[in-house]
Regions:
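Ser/Thr-rich, Pro/Gly/Ala-heavy low-complexity intrinsically disordered linkers and tails
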Residues: 42-60
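N-terminal secretory signal peptides
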Residues: 1-15, 21-33
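A generic alpha-helix propensity feature with a strong bias for hydrophobic helices
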Residues: 30, 50-51, 66, 109
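Beta-strand-dominated extracellular/periplasmic modules and repeats
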Residues: 60-259
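Bacterial lipoprotein signal-peptidase II cleavage site
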Residues: 35-43
Length: 259
């Protein structure tokens, strides 16, 4: 699949994470591009665009040359704008494949409409760019796309006080009953697709928790009706690189579960 590069500094470049996802409906398919980092492949039961036809969502990225290590400092360290729609360019002929649903999991509760979902938490800055298209590769506007994931320590936020739907949330499991997590809403957010079928979110690369590979949950809604609930993840080597070399992740070491 295609990959892009993100240059953050003219002299010493640090690797930010820029992730682009192409989501298609009717039938639903998903393609994932990661930019500014190592090659990565997701774990969700999805299929990529015409550049790849396996049963995984692929996230391919070329490492920056002469980089000065992974960026840190959370979303406040971002110095570049979101990339234009050429990020999603693939083949000249439209070809999509089915995306399977994945479990919602026990850590979901409905969140807020946000551009930056980090709530000033630390971590590897990540641009999450998602584009929703139909089976003819036409963009779909007016759809809600919601994402949620854990922090660098593998902990989910747990402040459900303003949530319209927290019926399935397992607070003890997801927050570990940590005081900070119980009062937080970090790494959760909703955005509505624009005329290009696209949303842009600022976040940080998620950490890991026992028995799960690193992943991000997402759901797509139209007129308050779920169109898809699923997850995507990243290749073992990509996650190992971050968890071994990034100061915000290295204290926990490599994930205990890989793809």
């Amino acid at each position: 699949m295609t990959s892009k590069k993100l240059t953050e500094k003219p002299l010493k470049r640090r690797r930010f994470m820029k992730t682009a996802v192409g989501l298609t409906l009717a039938p639903i398919a998903i393609g994932l591009w990661g930019c500014g980092g190592s090659n990565s492949t997701s774990t969700s039961s999805t299929a990529s665009n015409s550049s790849s036809s396996n049963n995984d969502t692929d996230s391919n990225a070329e490492p920056e040359e002469d980089f000065d290590g992974w960026a840190s400092g959370g979303t406040s360290a971002m110095t570049s704008d979101f990339p234009d729609d050429s990020l999603f360019d693939t083949a000249s002929v439209c070809s999509v494949a089915l995306t399977g649903s994945q479990t919602e999991g026990p850590c979901y509760f409905q969140s807020d409409y946000l551009d930056d979902i980090s709530y000033e938490q630390t971590g590897l800055p990540m641009m999450l760019c998602l584009q929703l298209i139909d089976e003819a590769c036409n963009p779909l506007s007016g759809y809600e796309i919601e994402v949620w994931h854990c922090d660098v320590d593998g902990v989910y936020s747990g402040d459900t006080s303003d949530s319209a739907d927290a019926s399935g949330f397992n607070s003890a499991f997801c927050t570990g009953n940590e005081v900070d997590a119980l009062s937080a809403k970090w790494f959760r957010g909703i955005a509505v697709t624009d005329a290009s079928g696209r949303i842009n979110l600022k976040s940080c690369f998620p950490g890991w928790y026992s028995s799960r590979a690193i992943h991000i949950h997402f759901r797509i809604r139209r007129n308050n009706t779920d169109q898809l609930v699923s997850q995507f993840g990243f290749s073992d080597s990509f996650c190992q690189d971050i968890c071994t070399n990034h100061p915000d992740y290295s204290h926990r070491g490599e994930p205990d579960t890989l793809l």
